[in-house]
């Protein structure tokens, strides 16, 4: 979001909406690429004009910030001495820079396309739908910005602010006002959007669901770290989420693992998502997470996720341990296996051309997996199972095209799911009370939990607590870019509790797991001995716990931004956003 530069972004909207990366939150699309005279001439062009917002401007965030900020910082992911793990990240960190660039890029694209859509020569319904999609994505970008940095500038119209020459003179706006701006933006989006849209694209229910989530976060913003959440905001979160649950016609998928399969890319549970395509010539249209998170050799192309591993603390939350004998592991939560691969796990939906995927065989059988990295590399005994598509045959089967040498896939990233909305409702109904016996709140909580654990009964639940709902959110949405933001919004109203959760996490790895896994496999798994030598195979306590302070809940601004706009280091200003801005 470097404010000094006015370089333009090339936008190829007529060729599927590709966008290149940019670094400025006052950037705008290159007007030479298209103009009102040669584009926005009919319904098809108008609908296509928004496609870019589902992919390219988010790419730089996806590559690093999407999993480093919400997953490593939250204690869901382990990655050695990563500064996000020990809270030593600074404004020179590439993930911080890329995240900032990406989110301001989304805002710039949404602003520019929205303004051009006003004069589009298309049917009124198509124009309104496209404009509503723009505003929803803009709101999503600001929702990330305010939860990552807190007080941030508001750039309502890039072109007018560039023309005014204010790009080095932007002041931060108080986070509470930024939240109100997001609410205002989503209210307009809801007004514009229809109740149904093309598969994979945002409709009114998606915007309402996002607004419910925004209200839930906003409810604590004025508590200064210790106080009662705003009851009216909680009521709005409950009202909106219940409306989506009861009236959208959308349902939870029956099997949790199915949500993340390629054939369900645009499933109705995915209310808002990034819709990637490996088919585009612009690599920023493809999903890079399989390369980032899958272990080496998992597919025919590049991947380097061996050392980015599900944390010990997340395994604890699921009730499992890497020291558990695979034959007697007792967890009956189906989300665990769909979230992380552990010793003994097999998957029938990956490597379908080879009869399925076997995790230990992949690690230790070079005939089966010639590209694997010579045994277990993960310090926590597990690897990530979400966001990866399998091998290229699986990609072709799901999408009809090869992932190609670009190493990027067509697998959607679900940014907001219906299950999230169920848990938003349950938490909003609990509100400031700590627990509830409200039947509708328990129903919502139970629907999510029962999908994952089939052998539980509704009559077992007569009360649910806030801690239960927050844990359920962690398990349900693990590796989907969410848990850190649950802790951030907790820090608004109970910062000591948020800090204590992090202080008490097991954020290190294990000693001795490669020897345990290799011996088990080589001695005839699944019937070989599982011999745990507790003197050698144990949780590592030599690395000290990170220094957890109140400051960790906001990232530093990129250093380049601060150099060009010193106002970013000054006190934020109050802005009456409803008086100042309008759509």
Residue ranges and their predicted role:
Residues 1-31:
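Bacterial Sec-dependent N-terminal signal peptides
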Residues 93, 103-106, 181, 259-314, ...:
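Long, intrinsically disordered, low-complexity segments
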Residues 323-417, 582-583:
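Flexible, polar/acidic helix-loop-strand segments at domain edges
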Residues 42-59, 80-149, 169-180, 184-199, ...:
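Conserved, well-structured interaction surfaces
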Residues 146-148, 153, 197, 217-226, ...:
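Short coil/turn linking the two alpha-helices of tandem helical-hairpin repeats
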Residues 23-83, 156, 179, 187-188, ...:
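An aromatic- and glycine-enriched ligand-binding surface/loop that stacks and positions planar moieties
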